[in-house]
Amino acid sequence: MSDSQEIPYHNQLKNRFRGYFPVIIDVETAGFDAKKDALLELAAITLKMDENGYLHPDQKCHFHIEPFEGANINPESLKFNGIDIHNPLRGAVSELNAITGLFQMVRRGQKDADCQRSIIVAHNAAFDQSFVMAAAERTGVKRNPFHPFGMFDTASLAGLMFGQTVLVKACQAAKIPFDGKQAHSALYDTERTAKLFCYMVNHLKDLGGFPHIASELEQEKTTEKETAL
């Protein structure tokens, strides 16, 4: 008997989000225009689901990134995120290396979870997704694992669950420690967002909101039909 047969249907990650593999993303940039402004830092964390159906952070990657040729650099953005693009200790890599590394990690996780496609999870996700997709287009990296426009926005989800849309406030509501001094580091924000997303998904499960009773009954009918064949 395989692992997937031993673990209940709804406790498998591939069945939790309709075949999507969720990946937490955070970026730090030199502006708001994904086509023109530099992508300066990128972090990502994949997720795994235990045999009881609870979500947990898994693998991570983190890159400081060199501005692409001709990129706009907004001084106000650098002041906000505290990034010194001229600091040699950043260890910055090219966009090509960063996007290649990201996609490789995500594709491995997606395959291991037997998911069909990956989906970006981020706080105010449209911003992060736009920069990842723009960098992928600029670099020409093939086999982009992410859905081109679908996303899970933790700001919206936290607004629904806690009435809070700011990351630090949402984390506080979920009793997740948040150090404001480390905020606007892509890796730290990704770690907090991953914990927040996992908390919301797991809390919904604990409250009895998943699996939804209708979907559970439908799955039972499907299983009965498959057994009868």
UniProtKB/Swiss-Prot annotation:
One of its GO terms (molecular function) is RNA exonuclease activity, producing 5'-phosphomonoesters. Mg(2+) 2 binds at residues 26, 28, 184, 189. Binds two Mg(2+) per subunit. The active form of the enzyme binds two Mg(2+) ions in its active site. The first Mg(2+) forms only one salt bridge with the protein. SUPFAM superfamilies: Ribonuclease H-like (SSF53098). Mg(2+) 1 binds at residue 26. GO terms for biological process: DNA replication proofreading; tRNA processing. CDD domains: RNaseT. The active site is at residue 184. Disulfide bonds: none annotated. One of its GO terms (cellular component) is cytosol. It is an enzyme of class 3 (hydrolase). Its EC number is 3.1.13.-. The record marks 32, 80, 127, 149 as: Important for substrate binding and specificity. Keywords: Exonuclease, Hydrolase, Magnesium, Metal-binding, Nuclease, tRNA processing. It comes from the Bacteria. Residues 23-197 form the Exonuclease domain. Trims short 3' overhangs of a variety of RNA species, leaving a one or two nucleotide 3' overhang. Responsible for the end-turnover of tRNA: specifically removes the terminal AMP residue from uncharged tRNA (tRNA-C-C-A). Also appears to be involved in tRNA biosynthesis. Homodimer. Belongs to the RNase T family. This is Ribonuclease T. It comes from Haemophilus influenzae (strain PittGG). The lineage of its organism: Bacteria, Pseudomonadati, Pseudomonadota, Gammaproteobacteria, Pasteurellales. The gene is rnt.
